[in-house]
Regions:
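Enzyme catalytic cores with a strong preference for nitrogen-chemistry domains
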Residues: 1-365, 381-386
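ATP/NTP-dependent adenylation/nucleotidyl-transfer catalytic domains that generate, transfer
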Residues: 56, 160, 217-219, 231, ...
Length: 653
């Protein structure tokens, strides 16, 4: 498989103001110590220090800078596949420019001048430097070499697909950022060489800007600022360094006590997918004005083509973190906020449907399982928005299949939420129907879908009819994971009048219910919610065991929901190949053998493709996240599509 994962890093080296020899040695040392990376970025004017002041006009300092650059280039000659960007003051046509210099495998590749020079408050850059806004497609002489020089340079590596553009400090703070144009011209990595002094509130503001730029430009953004070795005559510099990708903060470090290097592995395919999906992300119309220079930025393991096992080993070695439950935030506080926001979206969607139809009675079947519990919580929250909503709950037990545990949980839940309660036992109706069609009437063993589906359809049949009697809406309970796998009965639990859980994955359903349990301030409700969260997932369509316990467990049939949701996320959110998803799964679940993951993935893709016909006629329901399967919105797939391409890749991975 093509390897488009690269290790990048920010470096805050030790530094002495105006001591170019020392600073050069520090840069070379950190390059050698991090030679396994593909790209490193250093602070603004790191060869001299940012706080040299009028010393920037001294020939000895500027001559030493050029010598230092060639020393760094010579040292990089043995560092295969590593590109670095360092900051240096350079002369050009009787002017001095604050520059970023690309160096790769022994060569000074290109020089980019700073465009936006701050000359306000504590900053006075235009005293020494000239803006590079008019420097386009020039060459600058360093020693005997003539090197591409201009604000319109992007550094490209054909192996990994990395394309690097630059901001230099203030460039991030202005409305028309150079990095925005660079990304529109194809850059997927932005390096910001900075020298930003520290003040109250500035750290948070910087972080916000870096995250926003990496999100709106769909790029990896590497920000690194000079540290406390700068002169403290009037200012203190904090060495703030950050790496963000697609709006997500990966590293964040400030006030290092010594040299500080932060490295991460970034996935260039994720950037490509986001840009391709966001059709308003248009490439710069005049990007032909850019000069593209070749550099070497190796993928991890320095392998262009890589096997699943090799990439998994490389990612584990780098400590590459993959969330086992990508729909669920790792941070407890963020997870709690996410869960309540989802519930808020669901409730508002349902409330809008109630207002628009004028129908205030909500009819819902309560099984004592997670999905119907969440749907009932949504109804309960919608009632807070539309106080004259009336909730009518039905238990629809089937003797021998419904356990007393789930049945009692359903009753306790409805009592706790002040729901009008009804019960209709379905066994007699199901038996009569099965007799009509010539079915024996009892469960005929694994594969007797007629027996199972007759119960699901009977429940829907009853709910629809009682909704008509009550002039009500049937609220659907099925979740996103079930829809992805087709784990629902066509025209049974598949159908409703408004499906509130349709874009909530199973791995999140439990967290929402559990979160609500702890914030509801109602002890009886908390108790039953936690019981339900700890109940095995089952449709209870087959007889329970001899002890009255649940025998039919959903995950025994379709695999663990953790893995299924993992596959679903990366198929829909990023469109990754089965090989890539297997790599991520094995990285996230190191305890699993590859063959177990392969088996689960084969089952997932088979079901995902052959069950599309159920998703092609889904009821309305609110979108709550970036991954959803509505045939009217985010997922428009033909029901007749073949899974062979995906299955073959899974088998070969």
């Amino acid at each position: 498989m093509k390897n488009r994962m690269i290790k990048v890093g920010t470096v805050v080296p030790r530094m002495k103001v105006a001591n170019v020899t020392y600073n050069t040695a520090q840069i070379i040392q950190t390059m050698n110590e991090n030679a396994d990376a593909g790209f490193l970025v250093y602070p603004e004017l790191c060869l001299t220090g940012y706080t040299c002041g009028d010393l920037f006009g001294q020939f000895p300092l500027l001559d030493a800078v050029e010598e230092g650059l060639f020393k760094i280039a010579n040292a990089s000659n043995k560092l295969e596949g590593l590109t670095v960007v360092v900051g240096a003051p350079l002369r050009f046509e009787n002017h001095l420019y604050n520059c970023a210099v690309y160096i790769s495998e022994g060569v000074i590749v290109a020089v980019v001048p700073k465009i936006n020079l701050p000359t306000y408050s504590e900053f006075y850059e235009s005293r020494w430097f000239t803006s590079g806004k008019n420097i386009v497609s020039q060459t600058i002489q360093l020693g005997d070499e003539f090197i591409p020089f201009g604000r319109n340079i992007l550094a490209c590596d054909s192996r990994s697909g990395a394309i690097v553009g630059l901001d230099i400090c203030e460039d991030l703070w202005v409305p028309d950022k150079p990095s925005t144009h660079a990304c529109l011209a194809g850059a997927n990595i932005i390096a910001n060489l900075s020298a930003s002094d520290e003040m109250i509130g500035k750290q948070d503001y910087r972080r916000t800007m870096v995250l926003q730029q990496s999100a709106s430009c769909y790029c990896a953004y590497l920000y690194v600022s000079s540290a406390t070795d700068e002169s403290s005559t009037d200012l203190v510099f904090s060495g703030h360094s950050m790496i963000a990708c697609n709006g997500r903060l990966l590293t964040d470090s400030i006030f290092p006590e010594d040299t500080k290097v932060e490295t991460v592995v970034i996935d260039l395919e994720s950037i490509e997918k986001n840009r391709r999906h966001q059709t308003t992300f248009d490439l710069e119309e005049n990007h032909d004005d850019y000069v593209y220079v070749d550099v070497s930025i190796k993928p991890i393991s320095n392998q262009d083509e890589i096997t699943v096992d090799e990439l998994v080993d490389a990612l584990r070695k780098e400590g590459y973190a993959v969330n086992r439950n990508p729909f669920v935030p790792v941070d407890d506080e963020e997870r709690g906020r996410r869960c309540m926001k989802i519930l808020e979206i669901q409730a508002n969607g349902l409330a809008t449907r109630v207002r628009s139809t004028g129908i205030k009675n909500l009819v819902i079947g309560i099984s004592g399982g997670l999905d119907s519990t969440l749907a009932l919580l949504v109804c309960h929250q919608a009632r807070k928005l539309v106080p004259d909503i009336h909730i009518i709950g039905y238990t629809l037990p089937s003797h021998g299949n419904t356990t007393s545990y789930t049945y009692n949980n359903a009753l306790d839940l409805m009592r706790a939420l002040d729901v009008e309660m009804h019960e209709v036992a379905i066994e007699e109706g199901v038996q009569a129907h099965l007799k009509q069609i010539g079915h024996p009437g009892s469960y005929q063993g694994d594969g007797d879908t007629t027996y199972e589906n007759a119960q699901a359809r009977m429940r829907t049949y009853i709910l629809m009819d009682v909704a008509n009697m009550a002039n009500g809406l049937v609220v659907g309970t099925g979740d996103l994971s079930e829809l992805a796998l087709g784990w629902c009965t066509y025209n049974g639990d598949h159908m409703s009048m408004y499906a509130v859980n349709a874009s909530v994955p199973k791995t999140l359903v439990q967290y929402i219910c559990r979160t609500y349990a702890y914030i509801c301030n109602q002890e009886d409700l908390k108790e039953v919610l936690l019981k339900i969260c700890n109940t095995p997932i089952s449709p209870e369509l087959t007889p329970h065991d001899e002890n009255g316990k649940i025998a039919q467990r959903t995950e025994d049939k379709i695999g663990k929901y953790d893995l299924n949701d993992f596959f679903l996320y990366y198929v829909l959110r990023y469109g990754y190949s089965p090989e890539k998803i297997m790599v991520l799964a094995l990285t996230a679940y190191p305890e699993l053998e590859k063959e177990k993951v392969r088996e689960a993935m084969l089952r997932f893709f088979k079901r995902f493709f052959n069950q599309q016909f159920k998703r092609s006629c889904l009821p309305d329901g609110p979108k709550v996240g970036s991954v959803t399967l509505s045939p009217r919105g985010d997922w428009r797939m033909p029901s007749d599509a073949s899974a062979e391409l995906w299955l073959e890749q899974v088998k070969k991975a």
